[in-house]
Amino acid sequence: MRLAAASAAGLATPRFGDWDAFVSGARELVRTGTYPDRTTYFFFEAPGYPFYLAAATLGHPDDIALDKAVSAAAGAAAAPLLAWISLALFGSRRVAIATGVAGAILPSFVLFSSDVQSEALFLPLLLAAGGLLLRASDRAAERTAAKGRSAGLAVGAGAFLAVAAGAALAFAALTRPSALALAPLLLAPLADRRNAPAPRRRVAAASVIGFVLALAPWTIRNALHFGELLPVSDGLGATFFDGNSAWANRIYALKDRSEVAPMNAAMHADRVARLAALGLVPGTDAFRSPSRRSWALIHAALEDRRADPAGTRLLLLRKVWHWLRPYPTPFWGWPIVVSATVFYLALYAAAARGMMSAERRGAVRFCLAVLAISMAVHLAILVLWRYRVPYWDPILLLYGVPGAARLHRGPA
């Protein structure tokens, strides 16, 4: 289905705006064996997806059709992962299969894995992290209930799964740095009352170890290469500027697709001018510093916010609406807007019903924390509908499918 969607738009024609940054990073990896200092004028993209393109295409990332094929393959992993997590949560094969099918055909998942964009890889990594952490806690609970040799095997399996969960979250963060905000949730097993304190601590510690071991090599590489602390990339400044500068309210007020390109060009020119006013121009030591470029753009955006308190309040309201609204953008046309609105309103209702009736209350609280943290982080930085999808839509499906079944059956 994902390949069919990619073919419909043209296998050799990328549609996503940042595709060239990803491909150029992968190209430089293949050509020199090193990652470029910048993949755009302002920053270097998080390395996860470019590394994946370089490896999965066997060194041919300039082949856009092949890029789309390997992205579709990565995105397709979301469906079985959702089914696996659903089975662990609800113990029903029918619900798990239905959830997997829903994940395979959900338009947002299909769309984002049919082009050259990082969501195709980010979504399965994020799901893998959540599913592995869930299974690690379940194995620890089995250990609590077991005795003898079987208990020891459960402990070992639980620790291995926890390390893998932490590593998967680190790889997700190396693909989309916003996932760093979810790192504290690796400590969630500490609150699992099914387990004794010692197994809880082991699972939580193992997940943190896996996260650190997977993230540290890249962070150390950045420290050695730039002489600066950059956990993943220096893209925060440019993204924060987009979401908080004087341009942000204008962007969220756009109603016509034809206005987007001129607005982006004008905003790019403004960013360049603001950096130049501070002496940050290509060829200077100041510009070569990722942190200086990033912090300069953050400070510029904060100055805009301080100069316009009323606009800041309006911007926050617009961000909340753009995050929660049940359709992506009016640019897609009213038939899509109306159908997406009907679908997502129904999915919201079904997911709420599923959460209220779910027996595993700890898992519900964990998912609510993911919803809240992901929303808060993006409200502070930049809100786009495609940023919400990998964080919210899997949870909406996981609880929406059993919730819809309960709504269909009616009250017990």
Regions found by a protein language model. Name each.
Residues M1, T99-P107, L111, G131, ...:
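Short helix- or helix-capping micro-motifs
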Residues A79-I105, L123-P124, S150, G362-C367:
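Transmembrane-helix signature of polytopic, membrane-embedded enzymes
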Residues A69-F90, A128, L132, A346-R353:
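Transmembrane-helix motifs of polytopic, lipid-linked glycan transferases
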Residues S114-L121:
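Short acidic/glycine- and proline-prone juxtamembrane loop motifs at membrane-interface regions
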Residues L11-S24, Y35, T40-A55, P61-A65, ...:
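Extracytoplasmic catalytic/substrate-binding loops of multi-pass membrane glycan-assembly enzymes
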Residues L81-I85, A102, L121-A140, A164, ...:
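Specific aromatic-rich, kink-prone transmembrane helix
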Residues A129-A164, L190-R194, E359, L407-A412:
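Membrane-interface transmembrane helices that cradle and orient dolichyl/undecaprenyl
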